[in-house]
Structures are given as C-alpha cells and as structure tokens.
C-alpha cells in the first residue's frame, strides 16, 4: 500500500514539472533536478506540447518557432554526411543548436520513471520549481484525489406523476439556455378572438355574377349602413305605415356597365334607360300562400348559408335578372320569433327606352325601333327578431321599351348575339297586381306578336317561364357555390375552379383578333430567322423539319435535365458535320469537279461543301489544324510510320480544305485527337498516301488509351469511307 502511495505522489510531481516546463522557461539547475524524476518519454511529451504552442521544444530557449516551416517532405537525405534527417523532429526547434542540446538532455534521461524515491528529496526538487508537496509516509489517497468531498444527495420531492418530455428536458425551442415567452395563453386568447370574429362575419359572404359580361365573387364584411324605407302592412285593409329600417348591405364589385348606369342616373335623374316613374302597391294577407310557394322555390335554388346573391342575364329576346340576398340568420334563442318580411314594389307604367337600332341601313333608310324588355325580380329575406307581423314578399319589376316616338337619345343598346336577325320579334308584358286592384288576375301576361299565332294561357306561359328561370338559377347557383368554395379553400385558383364547376369563360373578339395577329407575326418571324442566322445548322438536315410547333413531338427539357454526350457521340457528330461530298471525292482520288457523284452514296446523303463568310471557316480550319499537328507525332510513333511528318501534314491540310467547317471546334482531349488523326490517316491511305495502309492495323494502343472500341471506330470510319477501301467493287449512288 505504501508503494502505491509513493507511485501516485511521484506521478503527480512529474505532472507538475511538465506543466511548469510548458508554461515557463527553466534554468540549468531546474533542468538537472527534473532529470532525477522525469523519464525520456515525459520529456518528449513536453517538447511536443511546446511545439504545438509555437515555442521552441528546448525548455531553456525562450524563442518562438519560425512561421515559414518547410513542408517538402518528412525526411531529408544528406549526401555529404550520408545521413537521413527527420524533418518533423527538426521542426520542433528554432535552431540546430537547440535540437542538439535537447537531444543531448533527452539521452541523459532514464527510460522509465523510478517508483522508489524519498519524499524529502521529492520536496526539495519541487521547491526549486516554486511548489512544495508534503509527502508523508502514509498518504491519504481519498484526500489527495478529493474523493472525500463527494456527496450524494437524494431528491425526496419526486412525485409519482409522469412528466411530459418538454417539462423534463426543457422547451424544445430554447436556444443556449434561453427560455422563450410562454405564448400558450396568448394563443388561446387569439384563437378565441378569431372564432368570435368568424361567428360575427360568418354570413357576410356575397357573390355577384352577371353573364356574359362580368363574373365576380366578392367576400367583404359590411361596413356601411343604409337607411331604407320599408312599407309594412298593419292590417288587411290596405293601410300602410312607413317605418325606418337600417339595412347593412354587403359590399360587392360593380361592373363598368353598372358604373356608367349609376353615373347617368345621377346626371339625368333617371335610371339611364328612360325609366323615371315609380308606383308602390302593398299586398294584403291573401297572397301569403303564394309568397310561401315562392319562398320554397328559392330555397331549392341551391343557395348556401353564406348568403349567396346571384344575378343572371339571359339573351333570349328579353332579359331576366335574378337578385337574391339573404341576411344572417338569427340566434337559436330567437329562432321562433324570426319572421319573413318583405315588400312588393311594382314599378309599372309606360317607361320609355331611347336608342337607335343596331341594324340600321347604311344607305339612308329609316331605322326601325327594336322592341326589347328586361324584367328584374328581387326577393329579399329579412330574418330579424321583430314583433309579430305579416310575411310580405318584396318584388320589383320594371319594363323598358325602345320607342322612337317617345324619347330620343344617343344611347345604343347592345343586341343579343344569340338572336337571329330574321326571327320574329316578341313584346311581352308581365304585370304584378293585387286582387283588390280590379285589374284581373294575380299575374297577367300579354303577348304582342307581330304575326298572329296560337295563343297560350297565362298559366302555361308562367309555368314555362318559371321552369326555365328556376333551372337557370339552380344551375348557376350550384356552379357558383362550387367555384366559390374551391377558391376560398385555396385548393385551386379561379380559372381551375370555374373549369371544374362547368363555367366556360370566352374571350372577347378583340382579344382573339390580337392573338391571331400575334401568331401571324410569330410565323413571319420564324420564316425570316434562317436568313439572319450567322451560324448555319448541320449540313444535310433541313431547317424546316426541326422543332415545328404543330408537326413535331419535341418539347422543352424538364427542370434539372442535363444532356451529356459520350466521347464517341461527340466525335461521331463532329465527323458527320465536317465530311462533305468534296471530302469523299478527295479521299477516293477524284477531282473536285466530280464531287456531285458522291452526293448520295449507299443511301447516305453528303451535302456540298459549305464555306462561311467573314473568314470564319478559315479560322476554324486553322484551329483544327493546330490540334491535329500536336497529335500527329504521337500517332506516327505508335503506328511506326516510315514517312515524313511533313508529307502527312500536307495530306491532312488538303483533306481539311474539302470539309464543311461551320461549327465551333469541340473540346477534345489529346487522346481523342489521336483517334481523329488515325481516322484521317486511314482515309488518306486509300488513294492519296497508300504506303501507310499496312501500318494502320497497329491502332490498338491508340484506341485503348482513348476508350474507343473497334466497333465504335468502324462506325466513325463508315462516315469517311462509305464505299470501303476498294471503291471499284462497292455499290454507289444508292444502287
């Protein structure tokens, strides 16, 4: 036990000496005193740590290591001394003198530490370094290692409940101990506020559609109040009481036609269409059953609970506009007290419509007034908790007639595009009346036809009109509700939503004319583009067959697509563009004038030679000639050709003169240029330089270095030698 304690004390003392030597500079006496305790490995550790700290490894030196340390190698061989020096060892010292002194001191140290040492001498050595350690005969290991200070504390406040992961490990969004503000309470408050706002404005959705001019959907909360006079019946005898009622109309978009109409109304005091008379009639209780039937019909229109208001314009000779709005429903407590209230206002009278006929004769003939009419039925539901009252249906209708003898104006009425010019013109008048008014039935229909025909009863006409209008309103409301839900949910945009709902938006004729003119201009530009190109396309490929929009299946590349050709594909494409009919004539020993014989060889088309203007072809030829000249000597060496390089260069230059050099020079490597030179020499060996033909078979070394196989080489060779090496026995001209 005593030996173990002494060993621990010695190791602790050596560690303190190492720390002192690392941080401070020692003197000669301290260094020799430390030699009694430290081993050679302990000192080497000190040298390494000092070198890492950019200090000289020798403890007696105070200088720093040089910054420009040579990193040429790990060892250096000295031919003068016949020795090998470790450069990593010399890099730990500032000079050769410190290296020698450190190695001398390290050689004087013992290999291992001594474990038997007197405690008195140990304290004397430590005193030299400014630190004393009282070493006793029986050392307390627990005290020296501070083990006696360890304490174990038990947490008795742990509850039996399970803690969440966030409470146990802390918040997941904490950054370096920062705990963010707890937003759970504020988020709950905001959610409650949002829900309350949604409950308030849940019914404030208004949709307005006018076909075929404008399609608009607006969702805006009402912010303005408008005071409207409601004519309310007190008893069934026709007495009326005027009562002010505050109505909150929803905000909706207004088309350009409506804005012009409102402007004319403010200017002339009329509705812009010649209607200035107004007559109000109050219905008694006797028509409540009819009102209930109308209410059921409008409930079947497909309007949702959001208060969808829809308007439709028909062009069947006369116009009918539906405008239905629904106010927010009452709460559940006042549901029994909710009553349907409304007004029936009939705008009747001989209203005039001014305008000139769109079908006027250009030769000076008199314009014939065209009869047209428009009927607007407005049904409004008021679900408010008022006192017990009557259920009143509010309906408005006005008639507009175009009469030249009543009123004249410069206003032009748009003619329906679906109406045939030679069709029979109808004039129908629908009047809503009271039974006590003495004017006949509840609904009176008068038909004024230009030609006599079979007359229908009022009930039949009403059934036909109601069925067509109900079908139109139901289909329109269903389509609009689907489109509005799709747009409000964010699943699709307006165009996709209308397409899915079955609504087709047709552009105006002016827009179509602009698109047609743009297409014609684009076609003219595409026809003129080939004459403006400075770099022509590949020879042998007509320009009209490439990427035709109407007759081609080519499409733009997808995103991230990168087309990379192999070395063989790039070489084959280059040779295919270079070789012309003049090249084949030169290869097979013919004159330049005989190049027309090689325009079509074995079904392959070889175009005429193309020379670019502005000297671009000559520049391309010089670039290719330089690349061939650098690769030619290596090919001659591999093939062992017994011929001068100058003669080969002359033949290659003559071959380049016959080629169509129109595109940029491909970025071939040296190994690929070797294959190009080999192909050209193989072509010249047919008739121009036949002496090198036996040596072409030594091509394996060149092909192996470039990665081109024999089959690929033969494929490229077929471009230069389509008739083979013996042209007199080969088929020609497609035969």
Curated annotation (Swiss-Prot):
PROSITE patterns tied to this protein: ZF_RTR1 (PS51479)
Biased composition regions of type Acidic residues, renumbered to the chain: 519-530
GO biological process, one term: cell differentiation
Zinc finger map (RTR1-type): 33-118
Region listing for Disordered, in residue ranges: 179-201, 349-374, 519-538
Compositionally skewed regions (Low complexity) per UniProt: 349-364
TM spans (from-to): none
Known EC number: 3.1.3.16
Protein name (Swiss-Prot/TrEMBL): Putative RNA polymerase II subunit B1 CTD phosphatase RPAP2 homolog
Species of provenance: Arabidopsis thaliana
């Amino acid at each position: 036990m005593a030996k173990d304690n002494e060993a621990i004390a010695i190791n602790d003392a050596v560690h303190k000496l190492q720390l002192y030597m690392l941080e401070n500079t020692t003197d000669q006496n301290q260094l020799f005193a430390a030699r009694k305790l430290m081993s050679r490995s302990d000192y080497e550790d000190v040298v390494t740590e000092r070198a890492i700290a950019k200090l000289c490894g020798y403890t007696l030196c105070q200088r720093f290591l040089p910054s420009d340390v040579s990193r040429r190698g790990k060892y250096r061989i000295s031919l003068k001394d016949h020795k090998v020096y470790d450069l990593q060892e010399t890099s730990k010292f500032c000079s050769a003198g410190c290296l020698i002194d450190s190695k001398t001191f390290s050689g004087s140290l013992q290999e291992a530490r001594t474990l038997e040492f007197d405690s008195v001498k140990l304290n004397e050595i430590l005193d030299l370094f400014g630190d004393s350690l009282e070493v006793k005969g029986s050392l307390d290991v627990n005290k020296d290692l501070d083990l006696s200070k360890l304490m174990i504390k038990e947490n008795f406040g742990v509850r039996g409940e399970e803690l969440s992961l966030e409470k146990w490990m802390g918040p997941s969004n904490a950054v370096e101990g920062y705990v963010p503000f707890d937003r759970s309470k504020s988020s709950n408050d905001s959610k409650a506020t949002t829900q309350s706002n949604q409950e308030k404005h849940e019914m404030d959705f208004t949709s307005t559609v006018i076909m075929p001019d404008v399609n608009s959907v607006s969702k805006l909360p009402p912010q303005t109040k408008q005071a409207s006079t409601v004519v309310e019946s007190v008893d069934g005898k026709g007495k009326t009481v005027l009562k002010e009622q505050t109505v909150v109309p929803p905000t909706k978009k207004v088309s350009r036609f409506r804005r012009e109409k409102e402007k004319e109304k403010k200017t002339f005091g009329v509705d812009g269409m010649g209607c200035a008379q107004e007559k109000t009639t109050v219905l008694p209780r006797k028509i409540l059953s009819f009102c209930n039937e109308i209410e059921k019909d409008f409930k079947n229109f497909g309007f949702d609970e959001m208060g969808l208001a829809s308007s439709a314009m028909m062009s069947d000779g006369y116009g009918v506009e539906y405008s239905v709005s629904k106010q927010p429903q009452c709460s559940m407590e006042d549901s029994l007290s909710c009553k349907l209230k409304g007004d029936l206002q009939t705008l009747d009278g001989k209203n005039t419509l001014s305008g000139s006929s769109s079908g006027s004769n250009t030769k000076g003939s008199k314009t014939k007034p065209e009869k047209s009419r428009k009927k607007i039925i407005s049904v409004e539901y008021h679900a408010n908790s008022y006192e017990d009252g009557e259920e009143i249906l509010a309906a408005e209708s006005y008639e507009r007639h175009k009469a030249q003898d009543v009123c004249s104006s410069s206003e032009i009425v748009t003619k329906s595009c679906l109406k045939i010019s030679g069709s029979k013109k109808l004039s129908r008048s629908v009047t809503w009346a009271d039974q006590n008014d003495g004017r006949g039935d509840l609904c009176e229909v008068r038909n004024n036809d230009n030609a006599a025909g079979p007359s229908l009863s009022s009930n039949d006409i009403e059934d036909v009109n109601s069925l067509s209008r109900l079908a139109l309103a139901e289909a329109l409301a269903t389509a609009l509700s689907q489109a509005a839900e799709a747009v409000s949910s964010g699943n699709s945009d307006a165009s996709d939503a209308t397409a899915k709902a079955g609504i087709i938006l047709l552009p105006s004729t002016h827009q179509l004319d602009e698109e047609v003119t743009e297409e014609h201009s684009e076609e003219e530009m595409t026809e003129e583009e080939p004459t403006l190109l400075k770099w022509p396309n590949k020879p042998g490929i007509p320009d009209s067959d490439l990427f035709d929009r109407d007759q081609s299946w080519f499409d733009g590349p997808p995103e991230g697509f990168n087309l990379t050709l192999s070395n063989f594909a790039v070489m084959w494409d280059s040779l295919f563009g270079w070789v012309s009919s003049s090249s084949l004539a030169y290869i097979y020993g013919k004159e330049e004038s005989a190049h027309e014989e090689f325009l079509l060889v074995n079904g392959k088309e070889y175009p005429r030679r193309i020379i670019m203007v502005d000297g671009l072809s000559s520049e391309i030829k010089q670039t290719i000639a330089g690349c061939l000249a650098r690769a030619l000597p290596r090919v001659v060496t591999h093939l062992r050709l017994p011929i001068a390089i100058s003669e080969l260069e002359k033949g290659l230059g003559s071959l380049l003169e016959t080629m169509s050099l129109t595109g940029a020079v491909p970025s071939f490597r040296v190994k690929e240029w070797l294959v190009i030179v080999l192909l050209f020499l193989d072509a010249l060996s047919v008739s121009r330089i036949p002496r090198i033909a036996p040596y072409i078979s030594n091509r394996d070394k060149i092909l192996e270095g470039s990665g081109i196989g024999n089959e690929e080489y033969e494929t490229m060779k077929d471009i230069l030698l389509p008739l083979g090496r013996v042209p007199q026995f080969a088929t020609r001209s497609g035969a």
